[in-house]
Amino acid sequence: LDLRGNGGGLLRESVNIVNFFVEQGTPVVSTKGKIKDWDKEYKALSTPLDTEIPLAILINGGSASASEIVSGSLQDNDRAVILGSLSFGKGLVQNVRPLSYNSKLKVTVAKYYTPSGRCIQKLDYSHKNKNGKANKVPDSLITEFKTANSNRSVFDGQGIAPDIEVKRNLLSNISTSLLLKSLFFGYATEFRLKYDTISSAKDFSLSDDQYENFVNYLADKDYEYTTESEDLLVALEKAAKDDKYFDDVKTEYEALKNKLNHNKKGDLYKFKDEIKFILENDIVTRYHYQLGQIEASLQHDPVLDEAIKTLKDTVLYNSILAGTNK
């Protein structure tokens, strides 16, 4: 189940999804409020579809609310391996109250708790800082809980932590700049006007000539960025000046600065694989829309690759759920 970027939905549907994979009567989620009326427990009510099929759940920082109920419940019941990165941490139950003048008020009435008893809420709105911003639950208050069958350790106050963390590769500064300036978007639009059709979403790939066209397209475009090395060099200069060493190393500093100065065109080739992948996804969207973009992105997806690897490795998969994998 790919729940990355899934911001949630209906509580009942999250219970129904979990019910596909666990025995009837299995606890799925509970809610607890300041008044007893909001204390409820939800269990799997129907006969499951399959309680044995190996199951992997993909999550990230955009997985929230109902999607965290699904992933957290299946993790707590030792039914699925969770992969990706820490989820959003939205564990609040909210109720909408009508007000005058056709307006409404959304009121938090309870919190969600997964079967182990942990609350997935990450921000503590009852203790805000002086700027009125909610703080994360401090490490000192994070509590350990245990899964139902294997007695594995899971923790509250931080969303859902994956069993296998797959770190996201950060974009290069040049790619970030091109995104912020909508230059991928602009070229993809021009590409769509020039070519009536392309191959299927999973097979589409820019030719070297087409990538050269993109490089030429950027020649007169305004985009600026600094590299991480250049940022560190600026910090080094400040530190050296503060410590009164800069005059002694100024010649060496200037030589290093000249060596590290980025070259836009050179970086377009240095980070070609990354830039080409982003551009191809943008172009595919013009022809095959959102479903096509998803299909194309899965061709180079480290989280999906790790999930497939885990599902194929029965020993690894079972050891994770049994809590014996170290």
Where do the PLM segments sit?
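Short, glycine-/small-residue-enriched flexible loop/hinge segments at domain edges that mediate gating
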Residues: 1-9
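Structural recognition of the beta-strand scaffold that forms the well-ordered cores
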Residues: 2, 28-30, 54-59, 81-84, ...
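Gly/Ser/Thr-rich loop/hinge elements
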Residues: 9-62, 92-98, 113
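Amphipathic alpha-helical transducer elements in NTP-driven molecular machines
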Residues: 11, 15, 64-71, 106, ...
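Bacterial peptidoglycan biogenesis and beta-lactam-recognition machinery
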Residues: 22-32, 65-66, 75-84
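Polar, glycine-rich mid-to-C-terminal structural blocks
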Residues: 66, 78-79, 83-85, 89-152, ...
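Conserved functional hotspot residues or short segments at active or partner-binding sites
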Residues: 119-326
